[in-house]
Structures are given as C-alpha cells and as structure tokens.
Amino acid sequence: MPAVKVKENEPFDVALRRFKRSCEKAGVLSEVRRREHYEKPTAVRKRKAAAAVKRHLKKLQREQRKFERLY
C-alpha cells in the first residue's frame, strides 16, 4: 500500500492529493474493483485473450500507419 509522509507545514489537501496519486500509480483501486467479485478461471482466460487480441490489433494498426506514411 502506498504511504505518504506529511512534510512540515504541508496542508492536508496537498498530502491527500499526493496519496491519491500514489494509489492511482500503484493500481490499488483497479485491483480492488477487479477482486470485488469472484471471477471464474475461464472468465479470466477469456479476458486475457481478449486483451491480447486488442493489443495485437493496436500494434498492427500502428505498423500500418507507419507504413502508409513512408509512401
């Protein structure tokens, strides 16, 4: 869990904002939402496969745009 040391004469709002930012970077909220309900192993595999397909298509689109710019 992210920890934030409050500096001397630092307003509470600033420390809270730093804490929220560190939680966001660590992915705490997304992890909590993901673990909120049980997900079947088949659903996990299906989600990961869909993410892999999405990454692959995104990579292909990037390469296609790069190729089109050259000519």
UniProtKB/Swiss-Prot annotation:
Q: Which InterPro entries match?
A: Ribosomal_bS21 (IPR001911), Ribosomal_bS21_CS (IPR018278), Ribosomal_bS21_sf (IPR038380)
Q: Which GO terms describe its cellular component?
A: ribonucleoprotein complex; ribosome
State whether keyword Ribosomal protein applies.
yes
Classify the source by domain of life: Bacteria
UniProt keywords (A-Z) are: Ribonucleoprotein, Ribosomal protein
User: For this protein, what is any one GO molecular function term?
Assistant: structural constituent of ribosome
Q: Kindly state a single biological-process term from the GO annotations of this entry.
A: translation
Family (UniProt): Belongs to the bacterial ribosomal protein bS21 family.
> Which NCBIfam families does the record cross-reference, listed alphabetically?
S21p (TIGR00030)
Q: Which PANTHER family match?
A: MITOCHONDRIAL 28S RIBOSOMAL PROTEIN S21, SMALL RIBOSOMAL SUBUNIT PROTEIN BS21
- Name used for this protein in its record: Small ribosomal subunit protein bS21
Q: What is the lineage of its organism?
A: Bacteria, Pseudomonadati, Pseudomonadota, Gammaproteobacteria, Pseudomonadales
